[in-house]
Structure formats: C-alpha cells, structure tokens
Swiss-Prot record:
One of its GO terms (molecular function) is tRNA binding. It comes from Rickettsia rickettsii (strain Sheila Smith). This is Small ribosomal subunit protein uS10. HAMAP family: Ribosomal_uS10. Belongs to the universal ribosomal protein uS10 family. The keyword Signal does not apply. It holds the Pfam family Ribosomal_S10. Part of the 30S ribosomal subunit.
C-alpha cells in the first residue's frame, strides 16, 4: 500500500506563496521523507470591467484583474514524523492550504 499526502497552496501574492512552499519543503526534508515539488499549477486570472461614471459616458471604463497563484507538493510514503512536522509549520496569513491524504492499493 502506497500512501501520499498532497498539499495544495493558493495565494494572491506569489512571494508569500513561494516562502510558504520553502518552509514546508524544508520541514519535510528534515524528516527524510520523499517530496515532489513544488509543482507550479496554472494561475487563474479574473478580469473585471466597470464603468468609471455611475450615470453617463459608457465608453469610459476601467479594468481590474486578480491573480490566483497555485502550487502542489506531493509527499510520498509519509511517516508520523512528517505529519508532526507539517502541523508545526507556521505560514503567512494570505496562503490557503488544502491537505489531502491519498491511499493507493
């Protein structure tokens, strides 16, 4: 049986996302576990167009965009020390973390 832990990180700021991935990778490497990544996933760009004026001047518009950056880390065959190390990692406030445990047969 082969177990894997998949960690997906999401953030609007790529610098804080890269810092969080470095902290997680260094914590996992201290436990001598096999880690793949960080794998950069495609970023999502949301664009919004709004009128500048609330009443007239339809041709005068303003555009905004928001970028969501994502990374994937895969830890192969984790042991209890890896789970303990991951629970002690302190990450930045703007980073969203999703952890999945996948068991293969």
């Amino acid at each position: 049986m082969k177990n894997k832990i998949k960690i997906r990180l999401k953030s609007f700021d790529h610098r804080s996302l890269d810092q969080a991935t470095k902290e997680i990778v260094s914590a996992v490497k201290r436990t001598f576990a096999k880690i793949n990544g960080p794998i950069p996933l495609p970023k999502k760009i949301g664009r919004f167009t709004v009128n500048r004026s609330p009443h007239v001047h339809k041709k005068s518009r303003e555009q905004f965009e928001i970028r969501k950056h994502k990374r994937l880390l895969v830890i192969g065959d984790p042991n209890p020390a890896v789970v303990d190390a991951l629970s002690k990692v302190d990450l930045a406030a703007g980073v969203d973390v999703v952890i999945e445990l996948e068991s293969g047969e």
